[in-house]
């Protein structure tokens, strides 16, 4: 059985506390003896004055006392200092990825096959290769639709709930692909019509500009005669202008 210290309450506890304080009062109230020499302990460059009668002298450990010899420059270790990293980088206009001109230049000259259907290059390109590329993409999308239909046929052999879910998903994808193909076809047709219209306009301009002759007005004719004949009688007057 463990023994516990007795508990005191009320007046009895007050009397016990008073007697205890009186018993230890003499230990801490003793005057300092001038004959006893005090010791000074230097702990981490902090001077602590400790008397010989002080209770903290027992079991006191001096941690890393600093001596005068260690404070010399030769005793200190020479550690190389790492330069600070700078997070500010001055980019040239050609290396700045946030530059609009740089981005447009890269997109123009980069042969990126994954371009959108309405890219800048395709809108301004009126060559036959561009139309052929669009038709190839339409054919690829039609092949994807055929593949989805084949998957739908294979999935129809499964359970009813799974078959219905797959069928609804495939039908939705098929409708979406059909709309995209229709938009591609309409855009391709519009481009073909625009190319034909521009070709006809250029043909009409070339038909009107078949003559290589240059006609001169009367004043230009007089100037031409003056230069050819070099005659003073053909001098121009203000009335000629």
Curated annotation (Swiss-Prot):
The modification Phosphothreonine is found at residue 108. The modification Phosphoserine is found at residues 116-117, 119, 232, 237. Residues 216-232 are annotated as: Binding to RNA-directed RNA polymerase L. Residues 120-160 are annotated as: Oligomerization and binding to RNA-directed RNA polymerase L. Its main location: virion. GO terms for biological process: symbiont-mediated suppression of host NF-kappaB cascade. Residues 55-75, 201-241 are annotated as: Disordered. Plays critical roles in regulating RNA replication and transcription through its interactions with multiple proteins. Tethers the RNA-directed RNA polymerase L to the nucleoprotein-RNA complex. Recruits the M2-1 protein, a processivity factor that is required for efficient transcription of viral RNA. Acts as a chaperone for neo-synthesized nucleoprotein by forming an N-P complex that preserves N in a monomeric and RNA-free state and prevents the association of nascent N with host cell RNAs. Recruits the host phosphatase PP1 to inclusion bodies to regulate viral transcription. This is Phosphoprotein. It comes from Human respiratory syncytial virus B (strain 18537).
């Amino acid at each position: 059985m463990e023994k516990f210290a007795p508990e005191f309450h009320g007046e009895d506890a007050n009397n016990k506390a008073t007697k205890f304080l009186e018993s230890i009062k003499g230990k801490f109230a003793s005057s300092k003896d001038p004959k006893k020499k005090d010791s000074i302990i230097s702990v981490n460059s902090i001077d602590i004055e400790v008397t010989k009668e002080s209770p903290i002298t027992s079991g006191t450990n001096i941690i890393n006392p600093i001596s005068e010899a260690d404070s010399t420059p030769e005793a200190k270790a020479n550690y190389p200092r790492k330069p600070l990293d700078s997070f500010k980088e001055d980019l040239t206009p050609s290396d700045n990825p946030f530059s609009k001109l740089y981005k447009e230049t890269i997109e123009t000259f980069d042969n990126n096959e994954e371009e959108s259907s309405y890219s800048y290059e395709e809108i301004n390109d009126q060559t036959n290769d561009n139309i052929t590329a669009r038709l190839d993409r339409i054919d690829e999308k039609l092949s994807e639709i055929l593949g989805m239909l084949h998957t739908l046929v294979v999935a129809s052999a499964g359970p009813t709930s799974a078959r219905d879910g797959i069928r609804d998903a495939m039908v939705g994808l098929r409708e979406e692909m059909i709309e995209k193909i229709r938009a591609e076809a309409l855009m391709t047709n519009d481009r073909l019509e625009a190319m034909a219209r521009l070709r006809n306009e250029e043909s009409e301009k070339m038909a009107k500009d078949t003559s290589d002759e240059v006609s001169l007005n009367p004043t230009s004719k007089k100037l031409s005669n003056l230069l050819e004949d070099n005659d003073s009688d053909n001098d121009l007057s203000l009335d000629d202008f």
